[in-house]
């Protein structure tokens, strides 16, 4: 009997709490309907969803600033060594105040105006080619009261001949030739008059030559 009374008392208390909770819920719902904004209050953050598919690539951005210069690289390998052929040079200019007393003899020049390479032999009056190539030779002779006749010779062959006679005054002759010479070819100026024609008057001669370009 005591247990039945205790159970009835417990059921009565539980009923009271259920009734109070129902009233409270009714009040809350009534307030919510009167103030709809209260329903917009966000709830707690849910768990992350699944990753979506990749998007389309974006447009390239503007160029960035230039970076700092890098460190010097290691030395490269040595280059190839090539032996360069130096350009040949040859030039002379010589002067004489007389012609040889016998014909068909080279004119002996006593003074070298220029012969830095030493290719002209003053003792023989002969130029010996040291560098194969194209050369220019020229001569100028002034004669006073005498006849002059000379030839430009190459290896014993006449290239050109000039002559003049100044019996009572002054005469001038000159000549220029372009010659292709090989190594050791010889060029000189040769007298073509006899001793009788050379006995009177005076003469002054200048003979020159230079390399235009080598072969």
UniProtKB/Swiss-Prot annotation:
Glycans are attached at residue 155. One of its GO terms (biological process) is hibernation. The keyword Signal applies. Transmembrane segments: none annotated. The keyword Transcription regulation does not apply. InterPro entries: C1q_dom (IPR001073), Collagen (IPR008160), Collagen/C1q_domain (IPR050392), Tumour_necrosis_fac-like_dom (IPR008983). GO terms for cellular component: collagen trimer; extracellular region. It is found in: Secreted. Residues 1-30 form the signal peptide. It holds the Pfam family Collagen. Residues 34-79 are annotated as: Disordered. Keywords: Collagen, Glycoprotein, Hibernation, Secreted, Signal. Its main location: secreted. Plasma; synthesized in the liver. Gene3D superfamilies: 2.60.120.40. Residues 43-81 form the Collagen-like domain. SMART domains: C1Q. Residues 85-215 form the C1q domain. Residues 44-63 have a biased composition (Pro residues). PANTHER family: EMILIN ELASTIN MICROFIBRIL INTERFACE-LOCATED PROTEIN ELASTIN MICROFIBRIL INTERFACER, PROTEIN HP-25 HOMOLOG 2. Plasma proteins HP-20, HP-25, HP-27 and HP-55 form a 140 kDa complex via disulfide bonds in the plasma and are hibernation specific. This is Hibernation-associated plasma protein HP-27. It comes from Tamias sibiricus.
């Amino acid at each position: 009997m005591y247990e039945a009374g205790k159970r009835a008392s417990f059921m009565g208390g539980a009923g009271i709490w259920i009734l109070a909770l129902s009233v409270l819920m009714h009040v809350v719902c009534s307030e919510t309907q009167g103030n709809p904004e209260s329903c917009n209050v966000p709830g707690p953050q849910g768990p992350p969803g699944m990753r979506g598919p990749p998007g389309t690539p974006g447009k390239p951005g503007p160029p960035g600033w230039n970076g700092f210069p890098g460190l010097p690289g290691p030395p490269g390998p040595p280059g190839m060594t090539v032996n360069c052929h130096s350009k040949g040079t040859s030039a002379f200019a010589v002067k004489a105040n007389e012609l040889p007393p016998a014909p068909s003899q080279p004119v002996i020049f006593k003074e070298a105006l220029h012969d830095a390479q030493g290719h002209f032999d003053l003792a023989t009056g002969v130029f010996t080619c040291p560098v194969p190539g194209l050369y220019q030779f020229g001569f100028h002779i002034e004669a006073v009261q005498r006849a002059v006749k000379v030839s430009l010779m190459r290896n014993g062959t006449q290239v050109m001949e000039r002559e003049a006679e100044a019996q009572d005054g002054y005469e001038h002759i000159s000549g220029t030739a372009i010659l292709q010479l090989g190594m050791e070819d010889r060029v000189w100026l040769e007298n073509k008059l006899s001793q009788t024609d050379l006995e009177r008057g005076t003469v002054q001669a200048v003979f020159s030559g230079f390399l235009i370009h080598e072969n």
